[in-house]
C-alpha cells in the first residue's frame, strides 16, 4: 500500500516500513538531495489530527539535544500529515533488552545516564514527557549507542498548558500520583517512569506486575499504589543502585528523588561519560541547513489543513490495532482485571 508522494516537490523516496501503531505508519525515507535517511511518521488526515498530535509536534519542535530524536519538519500529503524526524538506526532500547534478557549494571547505567540527560533537558525546557518507556527510547547505530527519546504525543509544557491531571502513559510505568486523577507534577512523575525503565534494564521484568499474573491490570495498579516491588535473588546489583531505586520508587512525589538529585547520586556519577558531564551548559540550538526550522505559524497552518480530510482519504487507510496499550483516558483502579497491561515479562527468563 503506497503512501502518496510528499505534496508537489516529492523530496523523499521510500526505503522501507519501520513501524505502525494507532497513529498510522512510520517509514524510513531518504532525502533525494542530501541522501540523508529520515524517519517519517504518517498520520491520517481528519479526526486523527487531534490535540495530542499538535502537542507532540509543537513540543518536539522546541527540543534540540543529543539524547532526543531531532524534529525536522511537518509536511502534507493528499491523505496524511507527515512528521519528518531524525532516524535512529539502532531501533528500540526495548528490543535490545529482549535480545539480551537483561543488562549488566554497567550497561544499564550507561543508558540510564543518557536517559536522565535527555529528560533533564526536557524539564529545563519546561516540558514533561509523561510517557517515558523503553519503546519510546531509540538508539543510534554507533558501537556505543546514543540513546534518543522519542514520541512526545503525551508531553505537556508548563509554558503552554496547565499542570497535568489526566491519566496518560503506559500502565507498567505510571506513577502512583498519576492514578489519583488530581493535579500532579509531571516532572516528578517522569522520574518514576525513569526508575521503571532502569528496573526493567536490570531485571528484565516490570517492577509492579505480578509475575504469576502479569495481565491483571487491577493487581498492577494496586502494587504501584503500595509500591510493592522486589529485586529477584538472581539479579546481583550494588547497594548504591538499590538505594537509587528506593529513592525513585516513593509513593509521595514530594519525597521522591528529583532529576537534579539523581544527577548527583553516587551510582549515577560512576563512569559518567565526559560528553554528558557538561551537556547542561551547552547550547544545541543549531540549525540544519537542509531543514531550516519551520515557524510555529507555518506548522499550525499545516496542522489546521491536515484536520480536513484530504481528497482520496478513505477514513480507514490503516488498521486500528496497536500492540502496546497507551492510556488516553482516565484510569479506574477498579477496572476489569482482564484489561491487558503493558505486557508480560519483557523476555522469558
UniProtKB/Swiss-Prot annotation:
GO MF entries: ATP binding; protein serine kinase activity; protein serine/threonine kinase activity
Known catalytic reactions: L-seryl-[protein] + ATP = O-phospho-L-seryl-[protein] + ADP + H(+); L-threonyl-[protein] + ATP = O-phospho-L-threonyl-[protein] + ADP + H(+)
Modes of activity regulation: Activated by osmotic stress and by abscisic acid (ABA). Activation by NaCl is dependent on ABA.
Family, per entry: Belongs to the protein kinase superfamily. Ser/Thr protein kinase family.
Effect of disrupting the coding gene: Significantly reduced levels of SnRK2 proteins activated by NaCl or abscisic acid (ABA) compared with wild-type.
Function as written in the Swiss-Prot or TrEMBL entry: Involved in early responses to osmotic stress.
Organism: Physcomitrium patens (Spreading-leaved earth moss)
Enzyme class: transferase
Keywords, alphabetical: ATP-binding, Kinase, Nucleotide-binding, Phosphoprotein, Serine/threonine-protein kinase, Stress response, Transferase
Binding site for ATP: 18-26, 41
SUPFAM superfamilies xrefs: Protein kinase-like (PK-like)
Pfam family of the protein (one): Pkinase
Catalytic residue positions: 131 (proton acceptor)
UniProt key word Cell membrane: no
Gene that encodes the chain: SRK2A
Region (Activation loop): 151-177
EC number: 2.7.11.1
Induction line: Up-regulated in response to NaCl treatment.
Family annotation (PROSITE patterns): PROTEIN_KINASE_ATP, PROTEIN_KINASE_DOM, PROTEIN_KINASE_ST
UniProt-recorded name of the protein: Serine/threonine-protein kinase SRK2A
Domain Protein kinase: 12-268
Amino acid at each position: 500500500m503506497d503512501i502518496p508522494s510528499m505534496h508537489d516537490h516529492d523530496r523523499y523516496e521510500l526505503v522501507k516500513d519501520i513501524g505502525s501503531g494507532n497513529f498510522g505508519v512510520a517509514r524510513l525515507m531518504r532525502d533525494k538531495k542530501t541522501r540523508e535517511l529520515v524517519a517519517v511518521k504518517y498520520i491520517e488526515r481528519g479526526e486523527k489530527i487531534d490535540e495530542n498530535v499538535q502537542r507532540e509536534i509543537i513540543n518536539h519542535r522546541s527540543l534540540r539535544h543529543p539524547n532526543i530524536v531531532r524534529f525536522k519538519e511537518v509536511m502534507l500529503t493528499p491523505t496524511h500529515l507527515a512528521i519528518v524526524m531524525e532516524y535512529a538506526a539502532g531501533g528500540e532500547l526495548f528490543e535490545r533488552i529482549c535480545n539480551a534478557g537483561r543488562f549488566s549494571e554497567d550497561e544499564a547505567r550507561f543508558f540510564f545516564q543518557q536517559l536522565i540527560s535527555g529528560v533533564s533537558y526536557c524539564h529545563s525546557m519546561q516540558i514533561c514527557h509523561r510517557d517515558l518507556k523503553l519503546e519510546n527510547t531509540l538508539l543510534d547505530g554507533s558501537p556505543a549507542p546514543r540513546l534518543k527519546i522519542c514520541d512526545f504525543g503525551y508531553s505537556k509544557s508548563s509554558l503552554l498548558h496547565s499542570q497535568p491531571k489526566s491519566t496518560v502513559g503506559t500502565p507498567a510505568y505510571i506513577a502512583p500520583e498519576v492514578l489519583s486523577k488530581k493535579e500532579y507534577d509531571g516532572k516528578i512523575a517522569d522520574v518514576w517512569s525513569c526508575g521503571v525503565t532502569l528496573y526493567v534494564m536490570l531485571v528484565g521484568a516490570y517492577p509492579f506486575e505480578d509475575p504469576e499474573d502479569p495481565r491483571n491490570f487491577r493487581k498492577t495498579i494496586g502494587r504501584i499504589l503500595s509500591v510493592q516491588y522486589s529485586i529477584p535473588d538472581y539479579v546481583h546489583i550494588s547497594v548504591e543502585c538499590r538505594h537509587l531505586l528506593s529513592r525513585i520508587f516513593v509513593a509521595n512525589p514530594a519525597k521522591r528523588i528529583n532529576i537534579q538529585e539523581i544527577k548527583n547520586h553516587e551510582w549515577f556519577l560512576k563512569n559518567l561519560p565526559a560528553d554528558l558531564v557538561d551537556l547542561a551548559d551547552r547550547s544545541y540550538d543549531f540549525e540544519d541547513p537542509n531543514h531550516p526550522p519551520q515557524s510555529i505559524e507555518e506548522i499550525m497552518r499545516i496542522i489546521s489543513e491536515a484536520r480536513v480530510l484530504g481528497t482520496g482519504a478513505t477514513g480507514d487507510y490503516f488498521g486500528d490495532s496497536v500492540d502496546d496499550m497507551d492510556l488516553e483516558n482516565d484510569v479506574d483502579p477498579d477496572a476489569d482485571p482482564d484489561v491487558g497491561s503493558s505486557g508480560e515479562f519483557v523476555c522469558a527468563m
